[in-house]
Structure formats: C-alpha cells, structure tokens
Amino acid sequence: MRPQFLKRYVIFFILLLGCLVFAYAQTADSVIVNQLRKEGITFSCNNSVTLLTSGQEKFDDLFKAIRQARSSIHLEYFNFRNDSIANLLFNLLEEKAQEGVEVRALFDGFGNDSNNRPLRRKQIQDIRRRGIEIYEFDPIRFPFVNHIFHRDHRKIVVIDGQIAYTGGMNVADYYIKGTRVVGTWNDMHCRLEGNEVNSLQRIFLRMWNKTTHQNIQGAQYYRGGLSDGHFIGLKPDPRNPAGHKMVGIINREPHTSNTIIRRFYTDAINGAKDSIKLINPYLTLNATLKRALRRAVKRGVKVEIMVSTHSDIPLTPDCVFYNVHQLMRHGVRVWMYTPGFHHTKVIMVDGRFCTVGSANLNARSLNFDYEENAVIIDRCTTAQLSHLFDRDKAQSFLLTQASWNRFRSPWKKFVGWFAHLLAPFL
C-alpha cells in the first residue's frame, strides 16, 4: 500500500474514532436539551424547583403562597372537585379578590363533568359573584362526540408572576385523604421560581384568552427571576444556593405542538446510558415508546418502571398490566405499587435530569390533550425523585412470571390482552 493511502486511512480512522468518542461523551442531559431546543423549547438556568411530594404538602404550600399574593392569581386545572379542599380554596380566593388581587380560574368541561363531584352551574355563578373570574374550557354540549378529544389536562398556578405550581394534582381532598376504592393517593407537584414562571404564565394567558375571548396581557404578569422575597414560610428548595437550576417547559397544544411530549420521552429514553426510572399511572404506551424501552435494556441501561395495582378508572389498568408484563419479559424491572394509587408522572434519566408535569403516557396525553411538563436538568432534584422511587419500592412487589401468575387470573390476562388493542383510544 502506498504511503499516501496509508496516511489517509489513518487520518480517517482517527476522525471516526473521535466522532464515536464525542458521541458517547455527550451526556443524556446535554442531548435532550439540544433536541428540545431544536423543537423551539427554551431553557433558563436561574430557576428554583421545590418538590411537593404529597397532597398535604402541595395544598399547604399553595395556600400559604395565595395568602401572600399581591397582584394576580391564575389557576388552570382539569377539574376542581366540589369538596372541602375546593371550598377552602375558593374562600381564600374570595378574600384575595376583595383585597384587589386579580383572580382568574380555568377548568376543563370534560374534566368537570366526568368528576363524581362536579361544580354545578349555580356554584359557578356564586363563585363569580364572590369576585373570582372562573370559566369552563370547551363545555360538553351536543353532539357530545365533538368534545371527547383536545381536553385541557394541565395543572398550573401562577401567583404574582413570580412563583408557579405544576404537576399531577388537580384540586380534590382525595390527594390528602385517599379514597375507599384505591386507598391512599400518591402524586407529585412542584413549585417553580425563576424565568420559567414566565413560560407557565404565557401558557395560562394563551388558554385564558382562547376560552374567554378577552385579551389579558401586559408586563405586570411577567416578572422573571427569583421572587422579591414577599413569599415567606414556603417549603425551601434544598439546593444551596437555590436559584441555579436549568428548567424548560414543554407545552403540548393540539395542532400546534402535537408531538412535543412524546418526542421528549422517546428522546430521553433513547439517550439514556445508565438508568431510567419511570412512574406513570396510565402506561398504555405506543409502539415507539415500547421499542425505545426494550432497546434501552439491550444497551445495558437499567430500566425500572413503577405502576399501581389499584386504579381510579376501568380497562386502562388492564392495558397497563399487559404492557408491563411484556416489558418485564424483555428485561425491564417492574415494581407493582400496592398501598394505593400512584398518580405520579415522572421520569429520571441517568441521575441527570427529570420531568414533573401533567402528561400521562397514554394516547390522550400524547396525541390529543393540552398538557405541560417541566423538564428539570438538575442532579439534586433528580436525586430527590430517585430517592422517593426507591422508598416506594419497599411498598411494591417485583413483577416476575411467578408474581404475574398470582396477580392476574387467566380471565384477567385475556382482558388485558383485549385492552391493549384499544390503547390508541385510551
């Protein structure tokens, strides 16, 4: 071989090796940030994130913040259940409205009507008379089929444009008390301070103006940065110093950003190198996500999933059980949470980043509804979630073929197989 050809081969080999080393050296968090930025998602690095790991923590923290509001309180929920917690909330909002604070609340029409204790028309009118602007997004009207999809499933609160809350919890007392059907109700929420509060405010005002045909806008609603200190007594961010977390908000809107959340989950799983921990209540999954999880196992990634043995709705859990059994057979470690219902929607990847938000891993959240998740690029917050995952493993059983046969009768296995055929509609 001529020397010049040998030299070219050596140079080519070195360049190829360098590309491979660079590709491997890219961490999962840098990959996901770059991919989301290509999708138009912005990230800021001056955020504080405080996890609220129970209904009691969430509502205690939220009510303390509302009591200290000075200018505006914006709430967007799938539903306000007509119970003791909602009554406390509306009484508190009435007090703030009488102080001159602007109070706006949105709820979803389907979310309200499908609730076993919905807000009735007279109650909504009474809430308005108390100074609270409250509106229903897309009320259910004939023909009802027109209103099945594109529901507002988000859970957002923004106070004074300075702090925001988001996660998996609506407004209901069962987040604290549990229910007779499922037992205790586990869920996750978080409080944000920093620039990404502005992102959540934009999401709220866009939906508010769409629903009410008003045109609410102005710099007074967008503060940015950490709060000015008038919110005291709230649960602190454990990171010291606080206010240096990278966060981006992924917002799914029908016809505008249809694929953003399913792309995030797919890219996060595909980019994992060491570990994936996933909790989601309605894990009906699509073929792409199932394939991504199986491939992660083949790459040597430790994949752990947690789902509940109890659920609040029919048929969907049968599909979930079928799916996790199939994943278990491909090497995924599946933990079956037994004390109650785990409604948490989180993923942790490589100990480097995580997400907290409203999106389930079912067809409704990934293909149809309005959803929103906070993507948190921070080892501290991810470690907190990972610790909670490991804590709940102690109250779960590991799915094996033997435990599967004890858990599901032949008839229930058939129901699960049938339910998984309906996954595109669940």
Q: Each predicted region: which residue ranges?
A:
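Bacterial N-terminal signal peptides
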Residues: 11-20
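Bacterial N-terminal signal peptides that target proteins for export
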Residues: 2-10
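Charged, low-complexity intrinsically disordered terminal segments
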Residues: 21-426
